[in-house]
Amino acid sequence: MLLSAPLRHLPGLLLLLWPLLLLPSLAAPGRLARASVRRLGTRVPGGSPGHLSALATSTRAPYSGGRGAGVCKSRPLDLVFIIDSSRSVRPLEFTKVKTFVSRIIDTLDIGATDTRVAVVNYASTVKIEFQLNTYSDKQALKQAVARITPLSTGTMSGLAIQTAMEEAFTVEAGARGPMSNIPKVAIIVTDGRPQDQVNEVAARARASGIELYAVGVDRADMESLKMMASKPLEEHVFYVETYGVIEKLSARFQETFCALDQCMLGTHQCQHVCVSDGDGKHHCECSQGYTLNADGKTCSAIDKCALSTHGCEQICVNDRNGSYHCECYGGYALNADRRTCAALDKCASGTHGCQHICVNDGAGSHHCECFEGYTLNADKKTCSVRNKCALGTHGCQHICVSDGAVAYHCDCFPGYTLNDDKKTCSDIEEARSLISIEDACGCGATLAFQEKVSSHLQKLNTKLDNILKKLKVTEYGQVHR
């Protein structure tokens, strides 16, 4: 009787003390985050002292910057959530689980060619809320998650995994085949000990290619979580103390499913161009005019001239940027097509350098000539006047007088006069003696005149013979000079 009064008031007392019991979960964000992770040396429900949560032991580089950073793109997945909705999960806590699922969906690229999502709800029975091919729109998918209701009693985790493997991860249900290389991922969330065997069925699921993540809450059995999860366990087993902080795990899964864009991060090591292939993969390419080396990263300029496809008629010249250009031999100019060449007519262009006459020899060549009466100098361009008097071929008996480039005339020594042939000369006195003062009609005068003419003709022949001899000597000298 003495104890009955205090016991009658115990429910009311618990209601008054309930907010105080929740104080650790209402602590500052930093403390709250720390409370969600079991540390070394602390007891984990269902486990042994010394267990360390996956969140505390992850060796991956922390993801920073969120999806807005532009370097993270979720990998395409076939993702199935297996959520415990047994009686131990209160309605408010089940809402937290749905919020956790929705936040993970927010970090994913949802679509027929991206990530597909299904939800398996379980307690003592199993219900597939929707299949992988049911929704391809993120907003519709989240609304479907929000409409899920708890099933009530029991925790048949093994049956839930088997149902997911046999009914959710099928091609008919929307799972993509092995040739697609799309990962199959299942995340099971539970707060209790399984009421059936999970070890064997989880092993079969993993052997079929399903990657299993196990998330334990509050009273979850850690050994069962380890049996269900894929290895390494430190990356696939998670534990939080309350459903109130489970949504914080969404950031951890965002990091897990994130494919970092190495091209945007600048860690690709491509010499020229980095091309993202999705799923965190990339390949290197080269700028135009370059080819990728065997290392798959560096580039070398393509020797297009060596390929014999350059089209240059005469000379191909490689440029530094991997391109090329055509050139021509001396005496040729590049045509408008920038490939073929045409012979330069230097005579027509006025660039020949000839003083008198330029003669085009074709093929871009030419030579110089001189006007008549001129001779080409040693430089093969300029001309000098040719002196015919100096050549000795003028034919003048006495004196040759040059009148320019090609002309000349003969002259006589003093006391001589130029004959009608304009080359030979006659003594003036002898010419006068030929004139007779006798009677021209007399026989004696006529005879005397004939004798004098014969004498002069003989002398003239003698002189002509001498001139011919001199000419022969001169010609011989010219030939053998």
From Swiss-Prot:
Which residue positions does Omega-N-methylarginine occur at?
193
Cell compartments where the protein resides = Secreted
Entry keywords, A to Z: Coiled coil, Disulfide bond, EGF-like domain, Glycoprotein, Methylation, Phosphoprotein, Repeat, Secreted, Signal
| PROSITE patterns per UniProt | EGF_2, EGF_3, VWFA
- Post-translational modification Phosphoserine, affected residues: 436
One example of the protein's molecular function in GO is: calcium ion binding
What Pfam families does the database record attribute to this sequence?
cEGF, EGF_CA, Matrilin_ccoil, VWA
Q: Which domain of life is it from?
A: Eukaryota
Q: What is its main location?
A: secreted
Residues annotated as glycosylated: 321
Tissue expression as described in the entry? Strongly expressed in growing skeletal tissue such as epiphyseal growth plate or in bone undergoing growth and remodeling. In the bone, actively synthesized in osteoblasts and osteocytes. Expressed in cartilage of sternum, femur, vertebrae, trachea, articular and epiphyseal cartilage, cartilage of developing bones and bones.
In this chain the EGF-like domain maps to 259-300, 301-342, 343-384, 385-426
Gene Ontology terms: biological process:
cartilage development; extracellular matrix organization
Identify the InterPro entries for this entry.
Answer: cEGF, ECM_Assembly_Org, EGF-like_Ca-bd_dom, EGF-like_dom, Growth_fac_rcpt_cys_sf, Matrilin_cc_sf, Matrilin_coiled-coil_trimer, NOTCH1_EGF-like
Per UniProt, subunit arrangement is: Can form homooligomers (monomers, dimers, trimers and tetramers) and heterooligomers with matrilin-1. Interacts with COMP. Component of a complex containing at least CRELD2, MANF, MATN3 and PDIA4.
Sum up the protein's function in the record's words.
Answer: Major component of the extracellular matrix of cartilage and may play a role in the formation of extracellular filamentous networks.
Q: What is this protein called?
A: Matrilin-3
List the source organism: Mus musculus
